[in-house]
A protein has these predicted regions:
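Dinucleotide-binding Rossmann-like beta1-alpha1 core, especially the glycine-rich loop
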Residues: 60-151
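Conserved FAD/dinucleotide-binding core of flavoprotein oxidoreductases
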Residues: 281-337, 359-370, 382
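Predominantly flavin-linked oxidoreductase catalytic cores and closely associated redox partners
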Residues: 162-284, 289-298, 302-311, 376
Protein backbone atom coordinates (compact mmCIF):
# COMPACT_ATOMS: atom_id res chain seq x y z
CA UNK A 1 0.00 0.00 0.00
CA UNK A 2 1.31 3.42 -0.97
CA UNK A 3 0.64 6.23 1.46
CA UNK A 4 2.22 9.18 -0.31
CA UNK A 5 0.97 11.54 2.39
CA UNK A 6 3.51 10.13 4.84
CA UNK A 7 6.43 10.33 2.47
CA UNK A 8 9.08 12.98 2.91
CA UNK A 9 8.25 15.92 0.61
CA UNK A 10 10.56 16.23 -2.37
CA UNK A 11 11.45 19.37 -4.28
CA UNK A 12 9.50 22.33 -2.92
CA UNK A 13 7.97 24.83 -5.35
CA UNK A 14 9.65 28.12 -4.55
CA UNK A 15 10.44 29.51 -7.99
CA UNK A 16 8.07 30.29 -10.86
CA UNK A 17 9.21 31.36 -14.32
CA UNK A 18 6.69 32.98 -16.66
CA UNK A 19 7.56 33.07 -20.36
CA UNK A 20 5.89 35.95 -22.15
CA UNK A 21 4.61 39.36 -21.12
CA UNK A 22 1.58 41.18 -22.43
CA UNK A 23 -1.67 41.17 -20.52
CA UNK A 24 -1.68 37.40 -19.97
CA UNK A 25 1.86 37.23 -18.61
CA UNK A 26 1.69 40.23 -16.30
CA UNK A 27 -1.81 39.49 -15.05
CA UNK A 28 -0.75 35.93 -14.23
CA UNK A 29 2.37 37.18 -12.49
CA UNK A 30 0.44 39.71 -10.44
CA UNK A 31 -2.29 37.31 -9.34
CA UNK A 32 0.22 34.68 -8.18
CA UNK A 33 2.51 37.22 -6.55
CA UNK A 34 -0.31 38.91 -4.65
CA UNK A 35 -1.26 35.57 -3.10
CA UNK A 36 2.23 34.22 -2.42
CA UNK A 37 4.02 37.25 -1.01
CA UNK A 38 6.56 37.49 -3.79
CA UNK A 39 7.78 40.86 -2.58
CA UNK A 40 10.76 39.87 -0.50
CA UNK A 41 8.79 39.87 2.76
CA UNK A 42 8.64 36.44 4.32
CA UNK A 43 5.93 35.63 6.87
CA UNK A 44 6.88 33.72 10.04
CA UNK A 45 10.25 32.86 8.49
CA UNK A 46 8.58 31.10 5.56
CA UNK A 47 10.35 31.43 2.24
CA UNK A 48 8.66 33.84 -0.17
CA UNK A 49 7.95 32.82 -3.74
CA UNK A 50 10.44 33.93 -6.39
CA UNK A 51 8.69 34.92 -9.63
CA UNK A 52 10.58 35.76 -12.82
CA UNK A 53 8.97 36.93 -16.05
CA UNK A 54 11.01 36.51 -19.22
CA UNK A 55 9.83 38.67 -22.11
CA UNK A 56 11.21 38.81 -25.63
CA UNK A 57 12.23 42.32 -26.68
CA UNK A 58 11.48 41.37 -30.29
CA UNK A 59 7.89 40.11 -30.04
CA UNK A 60 4.98 42.48 -30.28
CA UNK A 61 2.15 41.35 -28.04
CA UNK A 62 -1.24 41.10 -29.74
CA UNK A 63 -3.24 41.99 -26.64
CA UNK A 64 -5.91 39.45 -25.71
CA UNK A 65 -8.70 41.98 -25.76
CA UNK A 66 -9.97 45.35 -24.75
CA UNK A 67 -12.99 44.13 -22.77
CA UNK A 68 -13.12 42.47 -19.35
CA UNK A 69 -15.69 40.78 -17.15
CA UNK A 70 -16.71 42.14 -13.71
CA UNK A 71 -14.29 39.68 -12.09
CA UNK A 72 -11.48 42.06 -13.06
CA UNK A 73 -12.53 44.43 -10.27
CA UNK A 74 -11.74 41.97 -7.49
CA UNK A 75 -8.64 40.75 -9.34
CA UNK A 76 -7.12 44.23 -9.49
CA UNK A 77 -8.20 45.05 -5.95
CA UNK A 78 -6.43 41.94 -4.61
CA UNK A 79 -3.31 42.92 -6.52
CA UNK A 80 -3.42 46.36 -4.90
CA UNK A 81 -4.01 48.39 -8.06
CA UNK A 82 -5.97 51.62 -7.69
CA UNK A 83 -9.08 51.87 -9.86
CA UNK A 84 -8.35 55.57 -10.33
CA UNK A 85 -4.92 54.68 -11.74
CA UNK A 86 -6.54 52.13 -14.06
CA UNK A 87 -8.93 54.74 -15.47
CA UNK A 88 -6.24 57.39 -15.84
CA UNK A 89 -3.39 55.27 -17.20
CA UNK A 90 -5.17 52.68 -19.36
CA UNK A 91 -7.65 54.86 -21.24
CA UNK A 92 -10.28 52.77 -19.46
CA UNK A 93 -14.05 53.11 -19.29
CA UNK A 94 -16.87 51.12 -17.74
CA UNK A 95 -18.43 48.15 -19.52
CA UNK A 96 -21.83 46.97 -18.29
CA UNK A 97 -22.36 44.14 -20.77
CA UNK A 98 -22.85 43.61 -24.50
CA UNK A 99 -25.40 45.14 -26.85
CA UNK A 100 -26.18 42.83 -29.77
CA UNK A 101 -27.41 44.37 -33.02
CA UNK A 102 -28.87 42.44 -35.98
CA UNK A 103 -28.18 39.03 -34.50
CA UNK A 104 -31.78 37.86 -34.41
CA UNK A 105 -33.12 38.76 -37.87
CA UNK A 106 -30.63 41.22 -39.34
CA UNK A 107 -33.41 43.81 -39.54
CA UNK A 108 -32.44 46.40 -36.90
CA UNK A 109 -33.14 44.11 -33.96
CA UNK A 110 -31.25 44.60 -30.69
CA UNK A 111 -30.94 43.11 -27.22
CA UNK A 112 -28.49 43.24 -24.32
CA UNK A 113 -26.59 40.84 -22.10
CA UNK A 114 -26.11 42.90 -18.90
CA UNK A 115 -23.59 41.98 -16.22
CA UNK A 116 -26.12 42.39 -13.39
CA UNK A 117 -28.28 39.26 -12.87
CA UNK A 118 -32.07 39.54 -13.06
CA UNK A 119 -33.75 41.10 -10.03
CA UNK A 120 -33.97 38.73 -7.01
CA UNK A 121 -32.23 36.05 -9.08
CA UNK A 122 -30.76 34.26 -6.07
CA UNK A 123 -34.22 33.27 -4.85
CA UNK A 124 -36.66 33.75 -7.74
CA UNK A 125 -36.63 32.79 -11.40
CA UNK A 126 -38.68 35.50 -13.10
CA UNK A 127 -38.36 34.06 -16.60
CA UNK A 128 -41.53 31.90 -16.45
CA UNK A 129 -43.58 34.86 -15.23
CA UNK A 130 -42.12 37.14 -17.92
CA UNK A 131 -43.15 34.62 -20.60
CA UNK A 132 -46.77 35.54 -19.91
CA UNK A 133 -46.25 39.07 -21.26
CA UNK A 134 -43.19 38.50 -23.43
CA UNK A 135 -44.65 40.50 -26.33
CA UNK A 136 -45.14 43.60 -24.18
CA UNK A 137 -41.64 44.19 -22.78
CA UNK A 138 -38.13 42.89 -23.49
CA UNK A 139 -36.81 40.37 -20.99
CA UNK A 140 -33.82 42.48 -19.93
CA UNK A 141 -36.08 45.52 -19.43
CA UNK A 142 -38.46 43.53 -17.26
CA UNK A 143 -35.87 41.98 -14.96
CA UNK A 144 -32.84 44.30 -14.99
CA UNK A 145 -32.34 48.01 -14.39
CA UNK A 146 -28.99 47.83 -16.17
CA UNK A 147 -30.53 47.41 -19.60
CA UNK A 148 -31.72 51.03 -19.62
CA UNK A 149 -28.32 52.30 -18.47
CA UNK A 150 -26.63 50.48 -21.33
CA UNK A 151 -28.92 51.89 -24.01
CA UNK A 152 -28.43 55.44 -22.69
CA UNK A 153 -24.63 55.20 -22.21
CA UNK A 154 -24.92 55.91 -18.49
CA UNK A 155 -22.31 54.99 -15.89
CA UNK A 156 -22.67 52.15 -13.34
CA UNK A 157 -21.66 54.34 -10.38
CA UNK A 158 -21.22 57.94 -9.21
CA UNK A 159 -18.09 59.92 -8.40
CA UNK A 160 -18.95 59.53 -4.69
CA UNK A 161 -18.98 55.73 -5.02
CA UNK A 162 -15.67 54.27 -3.75
CA UNK A 163 -13.22 52.37 -5.92
CA UNK A 164 -14.54 49.00 -7.10
CA UNK A 165 -17.98 49.58 -5.50
CA UNK A 166 -20.97 50.00 -7.81
CA UNK A 167 -24.67 50.64 -8.31
CA UNK A 168 -24.74 48.34 -11.35
CA UNK A 169 -22.15 45.63 -11.92
CA UNK A 170 -19.43 46.34 -14.46
CA UNK A 171 -16.16 45.34 -16.07
CA UNK A 172 -13.90 47.54 -18.17
CA UNK A 173 -13.05 48.60 -21.67
CA UNK A 174 -9.34 49.43 -21.82
CA UNK A 175 -6.29 49.84 -24.00
CA UNK A 176 -4.63 46.40 -23.86
CA UNK A 177 -1.11 47.78 -24.38
CA UNK A 178 -1.46 50.42 -21.67
CA UNK A 179 -3.04 47.86 -19.34
CA UNK A 180 -0.09 45.49 -19.77
CA UNK A 181 2.29 48.36 -18.98
CA UNK A 182 0.36 49.28 -15.80
CA UNK A 183 0.49 45.64 -14.71
CA UNK A 184 4.21 45.39 -15.48
CA UNK A 185 5.07 48.48 -13.46
CA UNK A 186 2.96 47.37 -10.50
CA UNK A 187 4.33 43.82 -10.57
CA UNK A 188 7.94 44.97 -10.65
CA UNK A 189 7.70 47.97 -8.30
CA UNK A 190 5.16 46.67 -5.76
CA UNK A 191 5.12 42.88 -5.97
CA UNK A 192 8.82 42.15 -6.36
CA UNK A 193 8.65 40.29 -9.66
CA UNK A 194 11.92 39.99 -11.59
CA UNK A 195 11.58 41.16 -15.19
CA UNK A 196 14.09 39.92 -17.76
CA UNK A 197 14.19 41.00 -21.40
CA UNK A 198 15.57 38.10 -23.39
CA UNK A 199 14.77 35.58 -26.10
CA UNK A 200 14.42 31.93 -25.11
CA UNK A 201 16.66 30.02 -27.52
CA UNK A 202 16.59 26.56 -25.93
CA UNK A 203 14.67 24.58 -23.33
CA UNK A 204 16.63 22.18 -21.14
CA UNK A 205 14.95 19.12 -19.67
CA UNK A 206 15.74 17.04 -16.61
CA UNK A 207 15.92 13.25 -16.67
CA UNK A 208 12.22 12.90 -15.79
CA UNK A 209 11.12 15.16 -18.65
CA UNK A 210 10.40 18.26 -16.59
CA UNK A 211 11.69 21.62 -17.78
CA UNK A 212 14.89 22.28 -15.84
CA UNK A 213 15.88 25.63 -17.28
CA UNK A 214 15.53 28.05 -20.14
CA UNK A 215 18.55 29.12 -22.14
CA UNK A 216 18.33 32.74 -23.28
CA UNK A 217 20.34 34.86 -25.65
CA UNK A 218 21.31 37.58 -23.15
CA UNK A 219 20.43 36.40 -19.61
CA UNK A 220 22.02 32.96 -19.51
CA UNK A 221 20.18 29.99 -18.01
CA UNK A 222 17.01 30.59 -16.00
CA UNK A 223 15.99 27.81 -13.65
CA UNK A 224 12.62 27.31 -11.99
CA UNK A 225 10.31 24.82 -10.30
CA UNK A 226 7.18 25.72 -12.28
CA UNK A 227 7.09 27.26 -15.76
CA UNK A 228 4.07 29.22 -17.01
CA UNK A 229 3.69 29.49 -20.78
CA UNK A 230 2.28 32.92 -21.68
CA UNK A 231 4.04 33.06 -25.05
CA UNK A 232 0.83 33.53 -27.03
CA UNK A 233 -0.26 31.40 -29.96
CA UNK A 234 3.37 30.28 -30.40
CA UNK A 235 2.95 28.19 -27.21
CA UNK A 236 6.74 27.90 -26.91
CA UNK A 237 6.71 25.55 -23.92
CA UNK A 238 3.47 23.57 -24.01
CA UNK A 239 3.13 23.45 -27.79
CA UNK A 240 6.60 23.54 -29.33
CA UNK A 241 8.55 21.84 -26.54
CA UNK A 242 6.06 19.35 -25.09
CA UNK A 243 4.07 18.99 -28.33
CA UNK A 244 0.71 18.92 -26.58
CA UNK A 245 -1.84 18.58 -29.42
CA UNK A 246 -4.08 21.46 -30.42
CA UNK A 247 -7.81 20.73 -30.58
CA UNK A 248 -9.45 22.82 -33.27
CA UNK A 249 -13.06 23.83 -32.63
CA UNK A 250 -13.64 25.31 -36.08
CA UNK A 251 -16.41 22.77 -36.69
CA UNK A 252 -18.46 24.69 -34.10
CA UNK A 253 -17.10 28.24 -34.23
CA UNK A 254 -16.30 29.26 -37.80
CA UNK A 255 -14.66 32.65 -37.24
CA UNK A 256 -10.89 32.53 -37.71
CA UNK A 257 -9.81 36.03 -38.78
CA UNK A 258 -10.08 39.50 -37.28
CA UNK A 259 -9.55 42.92 -38.83
CA UNK A 260 -8.85 45.45 -36.08
CA UNK A 261 -8.77 49.23 -36.17
CA UNK A 262 -8.56 52.19 -33.80
CA UNK A 263 -10.87 55.06 -34.67
CA UNK A 264 -10.87 58.53 -33.07
CA UNK A 265 -14.09 60.20 -31.98
CA UNK A 266 -15.49 62.90 -34.23
CA UNK A 267 -15.84 65.21 -31.21
CA UNK A 268 -14.06 65.07 -27.85
CA UNK A 269 -17.39 65.02 -26.00
CA UNK A 270 -18.97 62.19 -28.02
CA UNK A 271 -20.73 59.61 -25.79
CA UNK A 272 -18.70 56.67 -24.49
CA UNK A 273 -20.71 53.48 -24.94
CA UNK A 274 -21.56 51.64 -21.73
CA UNK A 275 -21.44 48.27 -23.46
CA UNK A 276 -19.49 46.44 -26.11
CA UNK A 277 -21.44 46.81 -29.34
CA UNK A 278 -21.64 43.60 -31.39
CA UNK A 279 -23.23 44.02 -34.81
CA UNK A 280 -23.80 40.91 -36.93
CA UNK A 281 -22.63 40.92 -40.56
CA UNK A 282 -23.09 38.53 -43.47
CA UNK A 283 -20.17 36.28 -42.46
CA UNK A 284 -19.20 37.41 -38.97
CA UNK A 285 -19.73 40.36 -36.66
CA UNK A 286 -18.23 43.76 -35.83
CA UNK A 287 -17.13 44.77 -32.36
CA UNK A 288 -17.18 48.40 -31.26
CA UNK A 289 -15.55 49.31 -27.93
CA UNK A 290 -15.67 52.83 -26.55
CA UNK A 291 -12.62 54.15 -24.72
CA UNK A 292 -12.33 57.75 -23.47
CA UNK A 293 -10.04 58.84 -26.34
CA UNK A 294 -11.00 56.49 -29.18
CA UNK A 295 -13.07 53.54 -30.30
CA UNK A 296 -11.70 50.08 -30.98
CA UNK A 297 -13.62 48.69 -33.96
CA UNK A 298 -12.98 45.37 -35.64
CA UNK A 299 -14.55 42.68 -37.79
CA UNK A 300 -14.18 39.01 -36.88
CA UNK A 301 -15.27 36.65 -39.64
CA UNK A 302 -15.00 33.22 -41.22
CA UNK A 303 -12.45 33.07 -44.03
CA UNK A 304 -14.31 30.04 -45.38
CA UNK A 305 -17.40 32.18 -45.98
CA UNK A 306 -16.04 35.52 -47.18
CA UNK A 307 -12.89 37.20 -48.45
CA UNK A 308 -10.64 39.66 -46.66
CA UNK A 309 -11.60 42.36 -49.16
CA UNK A 310 -15.31 41.86 -48.53
CA UNK A 311 -14.82 41.78 -44.77
CA UNK A 312 -12.79 44.98 -44.98
CA UNK A 313 -15.52 46.65 -47.03
CA UNK A 314 -18.12 45.80 -44.37
CA UNK A 315 -15.86 47.12 -41.61
CA UNK A 316 -15.22 50.41 -43.40
CA UNK A 317 -18.92 50.77 -44.21
CA UNK A 318 -19.69 50.39 -40.50
CA UNK A 319 -17.10 53.02 -39.55
CA UNK A 320 -18.43 55.37 -42.23
CA UNK A 321 -21.98 55.04 -40.89
CA UNK A 322 -21.34 55.05 -37.14
CA UNK A 323 -18.36 57.43 -36.96
CA UNK A 324 -17.81 59.45 -40.13
CA UNK A 325 -16.80 59.09 -43.80
CA UNK A 326 -13.51 60.81 -42.97
CA UNK A 327 -12.73 58.23 -40.27
CA UNK A 328 -13.36 55.40 -42.72
CA UNK A 329 -10.96 56.92 -45.25
CA UNK A 330 -8.13 57.34 -42.73
CA UNK A 331 -8.54 54.07 -40.83
CA UNK A 332 -5.57 51.69 -40.63
CA UNK A 333 -6.54 48.01 -40.41
CA UNK A 334 -4.52 45.21 -38.81
CA UNK A 335 -5.23 41.58 -39.67
CA UNK A 336 -5.03 38.81 -37.07
CA UNK A 337 -5.60 35.19 -38.11
CA UNK A 338 -6.27 32.53 -35.48
CA UNK A 339 -7.26 28.90 -35.22
CA UNK A 340 -10.25 28.59 -32.88
CA UNK A 341 -9.62 25.95 -30.26
CA UNK A 342 -7.42 24.93 -27.35
CA UNK A 343 -4.71 22.51 -26.27
CA UNK A 344 -5.67 18.95 -25.36
CA UNK A 345 -4.46 19.75 -21.86
CA UNK A 346 -3.08 22.86 -20.22
CA UNK A 347 -0.79 21.61 -17.45
CA UNK A 348 1.84 19.02 -18.38
CA UNK A 349 4.65 18.02 -16.03
CA UNK A 350 5.95 21.29 -14.52
CA UNK A 351 4.53 23.56 -17.23
CA UNK A 352 1.11 25.23 -17.38
CA UNK A 353 -0.22 27.39 -20.23
CA UNK A 354 -2.25 30.56 -19.70
CA UNK A 355 -3.80 32.86 -22.30
CA UNK A 356 -3.39 32.25 -26.02
CA UNK A 357 -0.82 29.53 -25.28
CA UNK A 358 -3.74 27.52 -23.90
CA UNK A 359 -6.20 28.44 -26.64
CA UNK A 360 -8.16 31.18 -28.32
CA UNK A 361 -11.58 31.75 -29.84
CA UNK A 362 -13.44 34.76 -31.17
CA UNK A 363 -13.93 37.58 -28.63
CA UNK A 364 -17.74 37.43 -28.69
CA UNK A 365 -18.24 37.50 -24.91
CA UNK A 366 -14.79 38.77 -23.85
CA UNK A 367 -13.75 35.33 -22.59
CA UNK A 368 -9.99 35.77 -23.18
CA UNK A 369 -9.08 37.92 -20.17
CA UNK A 370 -11.42 36.16 -17.76
CA UNK A 371 -9.80 32.84 -18.71
CA UNK A 372 -6.43 34.34 -17.80
CA UNK A 373 -7.85 35.50 -14.46
CA UNK A 374 -9.38 32.12 -13.67
CA UNK A 375 -6.27 30.19 -14.73
CA UNK A 376 -3.90 32.34 -12.69
CA UNK A 377 -6.26 32.30 -9.70
CA UNK A 378 -6.40 28.50 -9.68
CA UNK A 379 -2.62 28.26 -10.02
CA UNK A 380 -2.23 30.67 -7.10
CA UNK A 381 -4.85 28.96 -4.95
CA UNK A 382 -3.74 25.38 -5.58
CA UNK A 383 -0.03 25.95 -6.15
CA UNK A 384 1.52 22.60 -5.22
CA UNK A 385 3.75 22.63 -2.17
CA UNK A 386 6.18 20.26 -3.87
CA UNK A 387 6.80 18.43 -7.12
CA UNK A 388 5.40 15.24 -5.65
CA UNK A 389 1.80 16.47 -5.73
CA UNK A 390 2.07 18.66 -8.82
CA UNK A 391 0.65 15.98 -11.11
CA UNK A 392 -2.48 15.78 -8.93
CA UNK A 393 -2.95 19.53 -9.13
CA UNK A 394 -2.34 19.39 -12.89
CA UNK A 395 -5.01 16.70 -13.27
CA UNK A 396 -7.55 18.85 -11.44
CA UNK A 397 -6.56 21.95 -13.40
CA UNK A 398 -6.90 20.17 -16.74
CA UNK A 399 -10.32 18.76 -15.88
CA UNK A 400 -11.54 22.16 -14.74
CA UNK A 401 -10.41 24.03 -17.82
CA UNK A 402 -11.50 21.41 -20.32
CA UNK A 403 -14.94 21.85 -18.75
CA UNK A 404 -14.62 25.63 -18.99
CA UNK A 405 -13.69 25.52 -22.66
CA UNK A 406 -16.65 23.26 -23.45
CA UNK A 407 -19.00 25.66 -21.66
CA UNK A 408 -17.53 28.69 -23.43
CA UNK A 409 -18.01 27.04 -26.81
CA UNK A 410 -21.60 26.13 -25.91
CA UNK A 411 -22.37 29.68 -24.80
CA UNK A 412 -20.83 31.37 -27.83
CA UNK A 413 -22.44 28.93 -30.25
CA UNK A 414 -25.82 29.62 -28.63
CA UNK A 415 -25.77 33.13 -30.11
CA UNK A 416 -25.57 31.65 -33.61
CA UNK A 417 -27.94 28.73 -33.08
CA UNK A 418 -30.78 31.02 -32.01
CA UNK A 419 -30.42 33.40 -34.96
CA UNK A 420 -33.20 33.47 -37.53
CA UNK A 421 -30.85 34.87 -40.19
CA UNK A 422 -30.67 32.88 -43.40
CA UNK A 423 -29.24 35.58 -45.65
CA UNK A 424 -25.88 33.87 -46.25
CA UNK A 425 -24.23 30.45 -46.15
CA UNK A 426 -22.50 31.57 -42.96
CA UNK A 427 -25.75 31.83 -41.02
CA UNK A 428 -27.23 28.74 -42.65
CA UNK A 429 -24.16 26.67 -41.78
CA UNK A 430 -24.23 27.96 -38.20
CA UNK A 431 -27.72 26.55 -37.74
CA UNK A 432 -26.83 23.15 -39.21
CA UNK A 433 -27.13 20.35 -36.66
CA UNK A 434 -23.63 19.11 -37.51
CA UNK A 435 -22.14 22.40 -36.29
CA UNK A 436 -23.85 22.34 -32.88
CA UNK A 437 -22.21 20.57 -29.90
CA UNK A 438 -24.38 17.77 -28.54
CA UNK A 439 -24.23 19.29 -25.06
CA UNK A 440 -25.72 22.54 -26.38
CA UNK A 441 -28.41 20.77 -28.40
CA UNK A 442 -29.53 18.97 -25.26
CA UNK A 443 -29.69 22.20 -23.28
CA UNK A 444 -31.70 24.00 -25.96
CA UNK A 445 -34.16 21.09 -26.06
CA UNK A 446 -34.45 21.22 -22.28
CA UNK A 447 -34.97 24.98 -22.23
CA UNK A 448 -37.91 24.71 -24.59
CA UNK A 449 -39.79 23.32 -21.61
CA UNK A 450 -38.10 24.88 -18.59
CA UNK A 451 -36.17 28.11 -18.09
CA UNK A 452 -32.46 28.01 -17.26
CA UNK A 453 -31.72 28.51 -13.61
CA UNK A 454 -29.09 27.69 -11.02
CA UNK A 455 -28.92 23.91 -11.53
CA UNK A 456 -28.28 24.27 -15.25
CA UNK A 457 -24.76 25.51 -14.53
CA UNK A 458 -23.24 23.00 -12.19
CA UNK A 459 -20.14 24.81 -10.88
CA UNK A 460 -20.21 27.57 -8.30
CA UNK A 461 -17.60 29.54 -10.28
CA UNK A 462 -19.17 29.25 -13.74
CA UNK A 463 -17.85 31.69 -16.31
CA UNK A 464 -21.31 32.08 -17.77
CA UNK A 465 -23.98 31.50 -15.11
CA UNK A 466 -27.56 30.60 -15.93
CA UNK A 467 -28.49 34.30 -15.89
CA UNK A 468 -26.27 34.82 -18.95
CA UNK A 469 -28.06 32.04 -20.79
CA UNK A 470 -31.41 33.64 -19.92
CA UNK A 471 -30.39 37.03 -21.31
CA UNK A 472 -29.22 35.54 -24.61
CA UNK A 473 -32.08 33.07 -25.01
CA UNK A 474 -34.86 35.53 -24.40
CA UNK A 475 -33.08 38.44 -26.02
CA UNK A 476 -32.94 36.37 -29.20
CA UNK A 477 -36.66 35.60 -29.03
CA UNK A 478 -36.45 32.03 -27.71
CA UNK A 479 -39.68 30.77 -26.17
CA UNK A 480 -39.98 28.40 -23.23
CA UNK A 481 -43.33 26.64 -23.15
CA UNK A 482 -45.47 27.01 -20.04
CA UNK A 483 -45.88 23.88 -17.96
CA UNK A 484 -49.36 22.38 -17.83
CA UNK A 485 -48.62 20.90 -14.42
CA UNK A 486 -49.49 23.08 -11.45
CA UNK A 487 -46.56 23.49 -9.09
CA UNK A 488 -46.53 25.01 -5.65
CA UNK A 489 -43.35 26.94 -6.49
CA UNK A 490 -45.06 28.43 -9.56
CA UNK A 491 -47.95 29.74 -7.47
CA UNK A 492 -45.49 31.28 -5.00
CA UNK A 493 -43.50 32.84 -7.83
CA UNK A 494 -46.67 34.22 -9.43
CA UNK A 495 -47.62 35.99 -6.22
CA UNK A 496 -44.13 37.48 -5.83
CA UNK A 497 -43.46 38.32 -9.48
CA UNK A 498 -45.67 41.39 -9.79
CA UNK A 499 -43.94 43.01 -6.84
CA UNK A 500 -40.47 42.13 -8.13
CA UNK A 501 -41.20 43.49 -11.61
CA UNK A 502 -42.47 46.67 -9.99
CA UNK A 503 -39.36 46.94 -7.80
CA UNK A 504 -37.14 46.60 -10.86
CA UNK A 505 -39.07 49.29 -12.73
CA UNK A 506 -38.76 51.65 -9.75
CA UNK A 507 -35.04 50.98 -9.41
CA UNK A 508 -34.58 51.57 -13.13
CA UNK A 509 -36.19 55.00 -12.93
CA UNK A 510 -34.11 55.89 -9.88
CA UNK A 511 -30.83 54.94 -11.58
CA UNK A 512 -31.77 56.80 -14.76
CA UNK A 513 -32.21 59.90 -12.64
CA UNK A 514 -29.04 59.50 -10.55
CA UNK A 515 -26.40 58.07 -12.88
CA UNK A 516 -24.09 60.37 -14.87
CA UNK A 517 -23.08 59.51 -18.40
CA UNK A 518 -20.05 57.32 -18.88
CA UNK A 519 -18.04 60.27 -20.18
CA UNK A 520 -19.08 62.58 -17.33
CA UNK A 521 -17.92 60.06 -14.75
CA UNK A 522 -14.65 59.27 -16.55
CA UNK A 523 -13.86 62.99 -16.78
CA UNK A 524 -14.49 63.46 -13.05
CA UNK A 525 -12.36 60.44 -12.13
CA UNK A 526 -9.54 61.76 -14.29
CA UNK A 527 -9.74 65.11 -12.49
CA UNK A 528 -10.59 64.17 -8.91
CA UNK A 529 -10.13 60.40 -8.55
CA UNK A 530 -12.34 57.92 -6.71
CA UNK A 531 -12.48 57.32 -2.97
CA UNK A 532 -10.42 54.36 -1.85
CA UNK A 533 -12.31 51.73 0.13
Amino acid sequence: MSLMYFMTPDQEINSIVIVGGGTAGWLTAGIIAAEHCANGTAINDLVEMQITLVESPDVRTIGVGEGTWPSMKSTLQKMGISETDLIRECDASFKQGTLFNDWKTGENDAYTHPFTPPHAYASTNLAPQWQKFRNEVAFADAVSSQNALMFQDLAPKQISTPEYAFNANYGYHLDAGKFAELLRKHCVDKLGITHLKANVIAINSSADGDIESLQTDTKGHITGDLFVDCSGSKALLLGEHFEIPFCSKSQFLFNDTALASQVPYTNSDDPIASSTLSTAQTSGWIWDIGLPTRRGIGHVYSSAHTTEDRASEELLAYIKTTVSPEAALSTSIRKVAFNPGHRAKFWHKNCVAVGMSAGFIEPLEASALVLVELSAAMIAEQLPANRQIMDLVAKRFNAKFLYRWDRIIDFLKLHYVLSQRQDSDYWKDNSAASSIPESLSELVDLWRWQSPWHRDTGHIDEMFPSASFQYVLYGMGFETQSSTTVRRSDREADSAAAGLFRENAERTQKLLTLMPTNRELIDKITTYGLQKI
